UniProtKB/Swiss-Prot annotation:
UniProt organism field: Aeromonas salmonicida
Record keywords: Cytolysis, Hemolysis, Lectin, Signal, Toxin, Virulence
Protein name: Hemolysin 4
Region (Disordered): 289-322
Any one of the GO CC terms: extracellular region
Family of this protein: Belongs to the HlyA hemolysin family.
MF-aspect GO terms: carbohydrate binding; toxin activity
Domain of life: Bacteria
Biological classification of the source: Bacteria, Pseudomonadati, Pseudomonadota, Gammaproteobacteria, Aeromonadales
CDD domains registered for this protein in UniProt: beta-trefoil_Ricin_hemolysin
Length: 578
């Protein structure tokens, strides 16, 4: 795969086995470095899992990827590139996977990427109080084989088979958002207390979609025997999509369908609708002087609603009204003057003669799939572990068969043109991909990550290490180990492991999160002092060793400082909307 490239083309190779070595893992990419290299510098990261052979090691490596990106894939290779100012993940299959070459050949100007990336890293005051989210794109590419689009040349006679497609393919980009909704209200418009995974089909990908044919061509078959009454001719027109189907399945019961879009799609359906689902909060704090010292609070929001255009030119009359299992289906490709089915089933009297040389129906205007549709899934507020989401994208390929029947009355006659609905002359082709979501990812806490800087040093911050031990290390705003979420209970939850909290009863090691007062903290007004609600003492540290302890506000030894500072870190993005 790599050897086939004419040049490196900005491709960076990353062996996933390096994540298994503790020393190499410490030097690995951070989340922000990944974004900077891909979005800022225009690099493409090729992550290679194929060299990992031990049964336990692949899962360990994928856990490391979840720490890096929030998701992982059951694939030997994953290509990370830029798309619309976000990361695009492309799981790769065999060495000749066309998706690899498609991504490598796509030209994104570095200047355009840098401009989008600069906006993503430089947040406004409103955005800094916005909803933390993990957003990424997932690319799916599959060629439709010759065999899958080969059908009988004639419906009436045995004239062999032919290919009914021209360069057919399934090329889709899915957008995935990971968010947290905190409950606000308990009646009517109340928002859920839940972890949210939003999967939607992107409709702006250049050249993307499900494509069978650019234009429709047809072939004619003529009866090779003397005929008074019967089929005189039939026509076989290139294939169209009878319907498109997208199914999202979860590997366990941790995720339930919250909303599927579209919920209805009729042939005359022309309406832009807003998703009826809202995320329960817009941000961690009000934009005020408290900044990162303010804990996460619930408040209402309507900023995260999703507008779904539901009028692609592929609408038909057979769409499913509801999608309780995370499945939605779009109808047949439309013809200029109405639906395909209605057109072909309409019988046209053509008089006593047979028109030769052309089919007696209008030319078709075809367009590949460009629908923006999706599914919103929710996990419980206390959900842990992980869920693998499998996305099946399929097209029901349908050749168009029509025919001319000669009617004989002894005295005179006529011919009729007829279209056919042969279900057995259709074939569904599916492309699948999957990704795994870690429900313990810090984005699902709903809070903005912050650090705790020790004021007795020039540049030391609190960091979680092996076995959840705490130490003072050089500050790094892109480090997950140095990031904490100051949650609605006043706890400092580790972004490295959201099941662990800073505990005043054991400051040498992070403890399992509870609602005990020993894990609840508040900032003294107009000061850099962090007070423990159980001991009513301040968080302090030894100015030589960095060892943490609780101290009284006054009368402390000279080698102790109770000065603690905090600021936002950059391991998650925060936005005011979508």
């Amino acid at each position: 795969m790599l050897a086939s490239l004419q040049s490196e083309q900005g491709l960076v190779y990353l062996n996933a086995s390096s994540w298994l070595d503790e020393q190499q893992a410490a030097k690995a990419l951070t989340r922000d470095q990944l974004r900077e290299r891909v979005l800022g510098q225009g690099e493409r990261i090729f992550i290679d899992f194929s060299g990992i052979t031990d049964k336990a090691e692949p899962e360990q490596a994928r856990k490391a990827m979840e720490q890096l990106a929030g998701i992982s894939f059951d694939a030997d290779w994953v290509l990370v590139s830029a798309y619309k100012g976000e990361l695009l993940f492309t799981p790769l299959g065999p060495p000749d996977d066309p998706a690899f070459y498609q991504v490598m050949e796509r030209i994104d100007t570095l200047a355009g990427q840098g401009k989008r990336h600069k906006r993503s890293l430089t947040q406004t005051a409103t955005a800094e109080a916005g909803l933390p989210r993990g957003a990424f794109y997932l690319k799916l590419n599959r060629k439709i084989s010759v065999a899958e689009c080969t059908f009988p040349r004639s419906r009436t006679w045995d004239r062999g088979d032919r290919l009914f497609c021209d360069s057919p393919n399934i090329s889709l980009v899915y957008r995935v958002n990971l968010e947290r909704s905190l409950q606000f209200g308990n009646t009517g418009s109340a928002t859920p207390d839940a972890k949210i995974v939003r999967i939607s089909l992107d409709d702006e990908s250049a050249g993307g979609g499900i494509q069978l044919n650019e234009d429709l061509t047809w072939s004619e078959n003529i009866a090779d025997y003397l005929l008074l009454d019967g089929w005189a001719r039939d026509y076989a027109t290139d294939a169209i999509a009878q319907d498109y189907r997208f199914t999202i399945d979860a590997s366990n019961t941790k995720a339930a369908v919250l909303k599927s879009l579209p919920t209805n799609l009729n042939s005359k359906y022309e309406h832009r609708r807003i998703s009826g689902f809202e995320v329960g909060v817009t941000g961690g704090v009000e934009v005020n002087k408290d900044g990162p010292k303010a804990s996460w609070r619930r408040r209402p929001s309507s900023a995260s609603s999703v507008t779904m255009p539901t009028t692609p030119r592929i609408i038909g009359s057979n769409a499913r009204p509801e999608c309780p299992e995370g499945e939605f289906q779009l109808g047949a490709g439309s013809i200029r003057d109405g639906g395909v089915t209605a057109l072909l089933q309409d019988r046209h009297r053509l008089g006593n003669g047979v028109r030769c040389g052309s089919q007696p129906h209008p030319a078709a205007e075809l367009q590949g799939l460009r629908a923006e549709s999706g599914c919103h899934l929710q996990g419980g507020a206390d959900e842990t572990g992980s869920t693998e989401f499998k996305i099946d994208s399929s097209v029901n390929i349908r050749p168009i068969y029509t025919g001319i029947y000669k009617h004989y009355y002894v005295v005179g006659g006529h011919v009729s043109f007829q279209g056919f609905e042969d279900v057995d002359k259709r074939r569904r082709v599916t492309a699948s991909t999957s990704f795994k979501v870690d429900w313990n990812h810090p984005v699902f806490t709903g809070g903005r990550p912050v650090n705790l800087q020790l004021g007795g040093f020039d540049n030391r911050c609190l960091s979680a290490g092996a076995e959840h031990g705490l130490s003072a290390v050089t500050c790094d705003e892109t480090s997950a180990a140095q990031s904490f979420i100051y949650d609605q209970y006043g706890r400092y939850v580790s972004a490295l492991d959201t099941r662990r909290c800073l505990d005043g009863n054991n400051l040498g090691q992070l403890q399992s999160c509870r609602l005990s007062l020993g894990q609840r903290w508040e900032w003294k007004a107009d000061s850099d002092a962090l007070s423990n609600l159980s001991a009513h003492q301040l968080l302090g540290h030894n100015k030589q060793t960095g060892e943490l302890a609780l101290y009284d506000e006054n009368g402390n030894p000279a080698d102790v400082s109770v000065r603690t500072l905090t600021s936002y870190t950059r391991i998650l993005r925060a936005t005011a909307g979508n």
